[in-house]
Amino acid sequence: MSSIRVVCRFRPQNKLELAQGGDSIVSIAPENDSVTINGSESNHSFSFDYVFPSNTTQRDVYDHAAKPVIEDIMAGYNGTLFVYGQTGSGKTFSMTGINDPNGDQELRGIVPRMIETVFEFISNADENIEFIVKASYIEIYMERIRDLLDTRKDNLKVREEKGKGVWVEGTSEVYIYREEDILDVINTGISNRAIAETRMNAESSRSHSIFILTIQQKNLKVGSIKTGKLYLVDLAGSEKISKTGAQGTTLDEAKMINKSLSSLGNVINALTDGKSTHIPYRDSKLTRVLQESLGGNSRTTLIINCSPSSYNEAETISTLRFGSRAKNIKNKAKINQERSAAELKILLSKAENEIENLKGYIKELETVSGVTVSNLKSSGSGSGSGSGSSSSSSGSSGGSGSGGSSNLSNSVNSTSNLNTSSNTSSSNVNANANVITTSVSAPTSPKDTELIKVLQEKCIQLEKQLFKKEEEKKEILEQLEQQQEQIQDKDQEIEGLNSMIESSNNINSLYQNSTNENSVLNVQLSELKLALEKSRFEATEQSLTIEGLNEENQSIKSQLEILKDRIAQSGDSSIASLVPSTPKSSAEMDPLATASKHADEWNEKAEQLKLLQRTPSKAVGSSKSNTATSSPIISLNISESDNIGSGATTTTNNNNATITPATSSNNNVEQQQQQVEELLPSVNEQLLESENQKLQKRIQEIELEFETYKIAKENLTMQKDLEIEQLLESQRISSSFVVDPRNLDDELPAEMMLQAEQIRKLIAENSEQKVHFEATKNENSKLKNRIEMIEEETRQRMEEELNVLREQTNQKLSEFGSLKESLIRDLENRCQKVIDLELVLDELQDRIVTLNERLKRVNKPGGGDQEAAFVQSKLDEITAVKHQLVIENNKHKTEVERLKKLLSHRGEHILILEKTMAINQESLFKLALNHNALTIEHDRAKNELEKLNNLLSQVGVDAQNTGGARVARVIRGGGGNNQLKKFNHSSSSSTSSSSALNHSSINNNHTTPTPLSANLYSNTKRSTKELNTGVKAEPLSLSGSPFNTSIPSSPNHTSSNNINNNSNNNNNNNNNNNIGNSGNIGGVGNNNSSISNSNNNSSSNLNANLNGNTPVKITSENSSSSLWNIFKKKSPSSTPPSSTNNLSPQSPQTPSHLSADGSGNISPNLSPPIPVNFSYTPAVVTSSTINKDQQKD
């Protein structure tokens, strides 16, 4: 039992307190163990383990408050370090301080100094001890536990087991190999922590943060494991709303902070009050997580931070009272140790030897007590019964003692017999006690009484020792049972993981099938879309042709009306009704005669349109009788020109006076008839339209008739119903007047029976017709709705596609327009050049004319020969220039023609490109649809895989990438004389470790030489392998593993390390693991390392070629002295425990001109030992590897 250690720290007054007129009200005793608050009303005194004044340095706080806790952690205890106080009292400063590499190192807080202490202890530890350091960082925000290393985990659960205690499930654990790893984890957590600004603090913590550091120590010689957990708790400060000015979310946070702190106070009150039977740990997540730290298995130190100012007098007194109450809490701390099987056997053998010794000693005591009793009996002061009882008891005790020794000998082979042996041994002690009590009952001398007392005390001591040994045996058995239960739990977890993997495989197969089906459906959909687009295009073309034909019909109608008016006006209105008929008929016959050549075509069109129903003779008679009113279209089918000619001659003989106007009108009619022939096809189409309209009207009439028929039918059915009702009523009335029911059948007429049957038939038919009518009505409504939906969908798709096509066509037209403008501009420039050359040519021709005139004047008599020669030379020059210009002009003309041809060719090429672009856009549209479907499926599969990964991460298989390592690797102790081994300590460049083994590359400028001890491998056998050469070990990267990430390198060296683990041979006799390492070891040359392991001969060879020329072969062996593997479940790929590996290091033959630092000597800098377990075969996570990792944890 140990009390919580409480220390108090006061900070200096800040600007706000000085501005409010605050004064220091703190008085600290010279011994620094008590403090007095000079309050406004009364003074308050408090006693603590240590009180730090305002001028205390960070180092003093760490040495007095935190360093003892760290030492307890390294001894195997659980430790907790609380920081409690008002908001703005300096809690975070005490914990973290100011971590500035270039700043004052004295301002560093507890955490960075704690890191130094941990790694100093590791470096000073024995070389046979391996360390595994893990870190996690959580916060309690608004009563929700969040993982600060993985912000996606925002609502973690608290679990509890009897053997394991209380822990938070699902936290991210990062394996630590150096100081920078812990700092990276802390910085990541601090950056993700919830903070806000208040009046009292610019960066006020809005949550309780808990940093958990787990240190596991394994003694390779003995095989024991000690585990210590350190909880660094930075509590959020209690707040007073009037001082902080919290509003909104900040106010809600303050409420939850004060609530959790009040729950913590209630727990402390319940622990310090001896009358409380219940401790309210479950009232808050904070007290639930820190249950072991408050009254449990932990050594706890509480640092209370206070303000010395009178401005915060109430808060300071409340904080001090909290600390004084917490000082009374008692914890039950014990070393968390797991003994190996060898240790348990050694303890068991020791206990058995001590029991044997105690039994022999008991026998001696029994003999001594028997002699004493017999002497007393012979002297006459005792009774015979007493001696007899003592002798009998001694005999019985001797027999029981022999039985106990036999049971103990059997317990070596079977631990189940421990209870029987303990029971027999306890019976021996009871027998001895009975002997002594019997001997005491007899009257003895003073010497005898003293001897008896001494014997009684020795027996009591022996009995206590025996009980202790029995308790230790029980504890050992309990530990064995717990380990077996843990192994079973791990097996169950592995089975669950296997089932999850099978389900994921099934999901992947379903996903493949669905993708194949989707591809087939997409192809079919694309074909249907192409057919739909083709039909739409044809429909639009047909609609355009119909619109054009309608316009042509309208124009033909107007022209026909004009022709009719002209024909009507061509005759003379003053001539009698018979006289003018002759010229008109003759005027019509002439064009009909010309049109007789096409009689066959006209007859076919007339038959199609059903315009002419008369024979040719009837047409002639009608033309003779009614020529004034007949239309030119009706007379087109008259093909007998002879009758027409005769009719025309008769009319001319009777009316000679009207020949001249008739001939003139005849010419006009011929011209009009030609126009009619040209417009005849359009007229035929118009007549077809009129016939269609008639048909539509006929259809409408039929529909109206159908509606009237329907209404009449309904009326008829209603009348029939009324008649039926009347008949029934009449039957009822007639049945009421019947007096004698026996004569009813005789009196009922046969007609009434027939009417009843007819009524029943009519009712049945009516019901059937109604049902049929309703069914047809429903089907029609459904079809209409479906047609409307299809039309709406097609319309929307048409609009969307038209918009896309419009945009594309506009874009192409704009591009074509720009290209066309550029070509036209070029052509215009060339044309302008041609025009300019023609102008120059004209000017030269004018000059030649003037020169010729001058030449003529010169050739006249009296002209000078010199002037003629000069003019002749100028004329020659001009003709040469003209000839050159003509040649250039011809060239330009040919160039213009060529450019025109090129322009036309480019236009054709642009059209072809536009067509191909339209086709490509259609294909791209289809691909986009397919891509969208595939992306949706990919996202769904990705989400399922993320869920599986999250489940795997919960059992420790796939830890999140939080700046630390994902694979556990041990750190070997430095041997007691060496300094801290550093993997990467560079002031010029700091790189975060995110490789597969979370081990960054080594910078030669800042490495500490750490030679290993000479007897590292002497007289010991280990399960780890270490590269004990004058080079620096490079990190290993598991290629093909889910834990593989990129390895950042230092500025001076670039290393790429790959571990290719090939385990394709499942033969149990020979299972080889090849690890090829190709990287730059020591920063010089290309280095290749190969490690091979075979289960056939159980040997491991490490061949490292340094600088391309230096082979180093190092082999190691699995531990045969450590019996930790007894508790492991053997995997098929693991090495048998009986196998041994020979260590045969070869001396490296390194040339003097090659070195790691370029100076000709290999640097003696060494990395910490690299534990590589060669018993695993696959590089990926399998069930066997998961089982082994979980057993180690």
From Swiss-Prot:
The keyword Nucleotide-binding applies. Residues 377-429, 573-600, 611-630, 638-665, 973-1016, 1032-1114, 1127-1193 are annotated as: Disordered. GO terms for biological process: cytoskeleton-dependent intracellular transport; microtubule-based movement. InterPro entries: Kinesin-like_fam, Kinesin_motor_CS, Kinesin_motor_dom, Kinesin_motor_dom_sf, P-loop_NTPase. Residues 405-429, 643-665, 985-1006, 1044-1078, 1086-1109, 1132-1149 have a biased composition (Low complexity). ATP binds at residues 85-92. GO terms for cellular component: cytoplasm; kinesin complex; microtubule. Residues 573-585, 614-630, 1007-1016, 1150-1165, 1174-1193 have a biased composition (Polar residues). Keywords: ATP-binding, Coiled coil, Cytoplasm, Cytoskeleton, Microtubule, Motor protein, Nucleotide-binding, Transport. GO terms for molecular function: ATP binding; ATP hydrolysis activity; identical protein binding; microtubule binding; microtubule motor activity; plus-end-directed microtubule motor activity. Its main location: cytoplasm. SMART domains: KISc. Residues 450-962 form a coiled coil. It comes from the Eukaryota. It is found in: Cytoplasm, Cytoskeleton. Composed of three structural domains: a large globular N-terminal domain which is responsible for the motor activity of kinesin (it hydrolyzes ATP and binds microtubule), a central alpha-helical coiled coil domain that mediates the heavy chain dimerization; and a small globular C-terminal domain which interacts with other proteins, vesicles and membranous organelles. Microtubule-associated force-producing protein that plays a role in organelle transport. Its motor activity is directed toward the microtubule's plus end. The maximal velocity in an inverted motility assay (moving microtubules on fixed motors) was 1.96 um/s. Belongs to the TRAFAC class myosin-kinesin ATPase superfamily. Kinesin family. Kinesin subfamily. Dimer. This is Kinesin-related protein 3. It comes from Dictyostelium discoideum (Social amoeba).
